[in-house]
Regions:
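Sec-dependent N-terminal signal peptides
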Residues: 19-28
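Catalytic-loop region of hydrolases
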Residues: 35-98
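N-terminal cap/lid subdomain of alpha/beta-hydrolase-fold enzymes
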Residues: 74-175
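Alpha/beta-hydrolase active-site loop
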Residues: 145, 155, 175-194
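Active-site nucleophile loop of the alpha/beta-hydrolase fold
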Residues: 155, 233-245
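Alpha/beta-hydrolase fold nucleophile elbow
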Residues: 199-211
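Glycine-rich nucleophile elbow surrounding the catalytic serine of serine-hydrolase chemistry
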Residues: 208-221
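Conserved small/polar residues in nucleotide/adenosyl-binding loops
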Residues: 269-271
Length: 271
């Protein structure tokens, strides 16, 4: 009986201990989820690095942060998250190109161009674009950082970019969500960024991937007309042409699908 009582006491203590731990975990979890995520409107962090591009050492700084968007009254209404790579072993950057890179979607983050194409590091993937185990990243020997500084920008509601002012869905759409609205606030943001980093003398380029092709075309016009920023060039990476893609009676989709139909037919023959 004494042994049974000791076992029962041990079970009771173990049960109470578990209940206490569960209570603490629930308390912490409730506090964590009840707190609203706060994103600073204007902040940055700079670190120093070096990499190898085309068998040559390149020293550079990486600046990550957020930069505000203001309304006509000077109130902060939103903030855009960005990553800025700048080569640091160059004495004069007045002739060094500055590139602003955008992905498509239009709701796609800049991480795809950042870690998949032009940044100093890239994901470990095969020739078809699939990840290779063990998963990770590596130095990108094809990065363009050796010849140009790069700013990867996340538009509103992408990545850590957020609307900070409370507004209705209709107000947000009128301000941010549309081809022209997109170009307008991005142009204002770019003008501020170039002023802050003192890069007005630098040659400036835009890179747009997929829908980013449409974005940078509209942005180039907006920059020239309303920000007095004249670009030196625009780079389109597999740009999307939605009018051509969905044009009634067009031949683009049938031509693209033809190879897949042929491969399917050949595979059926061998079954």
């Amino acid at each position: 009986m004494k042994i049974l009582k000791l076992k029962q006491d041990h079970i009771n203590k173990y049960t109470m201990k578990n209940k206490f731990l569960i209570f603490i975990i629930m308390l912490i979890s409730t506090g964590s989820f009840s707190q609203e995520r706060i994103i600073s409107a204007d902040t940055s962090k700079i670190t120093k690095h070096s990499t190898i591009i085309l068998n040559k050492k390149v020293n550079y700084s990486a600046q990550i942060g957020t930069q505000p968007i203001w309304d006509v009254e000077g109130q902060v209404i939103a903030t855009l998250h960005y990553t800025y790579y700048k080569r640091t072993d160059i004495n004069d950057d007045s002739n060094r190109p500055l590139i602003f890179s955008f992905n498509g979607g239009p709701g796609s983050a800049s991480i795809w161009m950042h870690m998949g194409y032009t940044g100093p590091y890239s994901l470990t993937i095969d020739d078809e674009g699939y990840p290779i185990q063990p998963y990770g990243y590596k130095t990108n020997p094809y990065s363009i950082l050796d010849v140009a500084d790069i700013v990867f920008v996340n538009p509103i509601n992408i990545g850590y970019s957020r609307i900070l002012k409370k507004m209705s869905k209709e107000e947000a759409t009128d301000k941010f969500f549309g081809v022209n609205q997109d170009a307008k606030y991005l142009a204002e943001w770019m003008s501020t960024f170039v002023s802050r980093t003192e890069r007005w003398k630098s040659p400036k380029y835009l890179v747009g991937e997929s829908y980013g092709g449409i974005r940078v075309m509209a942005l180039a016009s907006e920059l020239q007309q309303n920000q007095w920023m004249y670009l030196n060039g625009v780079v389109l990476v597999s740009p999307a042409d939605y009018e051509l893609r969905y044009e009634s009676g067009g031949i683009i989709l049938p031509v693209v699908d033809f190879l897949y139909f042929t491969a399917t037919a050949l595979s059926l023959i061998h079954i």
